[in-house]
Amino acid sequence: MIEARDVSVDIAGKRIVGGVDFDARPGEVAAIVGPNGSGKTTFLKALSGEFAYTGRIALNGHNLSSMRPAEMAVHRAVLPQATTLSFPFTVREVVKLGLVGGRSGALPGEDARLPERALARVDLDGFAGRFYQELSGGEQQRVQLARVLCQVWAPVLDGKPRYLFLDEPVSSLDIKHQLIIMNIARDFAKRGGGVVAILHDLNLTSMYADRIFVMHRGRLAATGSPQDVLSDDLIEKVFDCRLRVGVLPAGNMPFVLPQSSVY
């Protein structure tokens, strides 16, 4: 489990995240949503150990501030918003970087085949020999996800859940691949791991998230299930946009259409 209590982050003397309480449980997808500049990525970087913070964050019972990077890498893998490479790596070489720590959790002898298996999962079968720089933005994003999957291939290792931290994992993808990637996240959670994902698409969030954490001006504005959180009033307050939230009869699933704008 990931637990964060009263977490704040200051950058260049300015408070970006203030007093946030958060928890991510194994077996669920936790989505962080909010407008641009609300502190989502900054908070995720604190959760992943990249940014300094005040307050307390625990990862599987361990105080995050006392964990070494190699130790954190066993428990969680991070997909950033964007990754730039300056050298002509092949796709397979990029994906293999996820195996550097040697704790993928794959069965003995399977590590050598993991890059190809991970690429197949993100619908890039046959791309291993291509150069990374030759790919489109969406293809590069999926290569990076394959790398991350190799790092924590087994969602549970030594009896402890592992976590995927995904910062806008579908931002560059067409609708088919958005669904593929979100199904990968859901499957990872179903098999005992946990997922923390920053998302902008409220409909995908409603479809896949077990709980939503809504950030606004560096603080949490709401927390709960999609049914509890997504409402006309909250969207107007947080996103400064008057939209009507509909509900699908099957599963009581909320949805939001831009055509419902009531300006």
Curated annotation (Swiss-Prot):
GO terms for molecular function: ATP binding; ATP hydrolysis activity. Coiled coil: none annotated. Keywords: ATP-binding, Cell inner membrane, Cell membrane, Membrane, Nucleotide-binding, Translocase, Transport. It is an enzyme of class 7 (translocase). Its EC number is 7.6.2.-. Its main location: membrane. It is found in: Cell inner membrane. It is a peripheral membrane protein. GO terms for cellular component: plasma membrane. It comes from the Bacteria. The keyword Transport applies. ATP binds at G34, P35, N36, G37, S38, G39, K40, T41. Residues 2-242 form the ABC transporter domain. It holds the Pfam family ABC_tran. The keyword Mitochondrion does not apply. The complex is composed of two ATP-binding proteins (HmuV), two transmembrane proteins (HmuU) and a solute-binding protein (HmuT). Belongs to the ABC transporter superfamily. Heme (hemin) importer (TC 3.A.1.14.5) family. Part of the ABC transporter complex HmuTUV involved in hemin import. Responsible for energy coupling to the transport system. This is Hemin import ATP-binding protein HmuV. It comes from Mesorhizobium japonicum (strain LMG 29417 / CECT 9101 / MAFF 303099). The lineage of its organism: Bacteria, Pseudomonadati, Pseudomonadota, Alphaproteobacteria, Hyphomicrobiales.
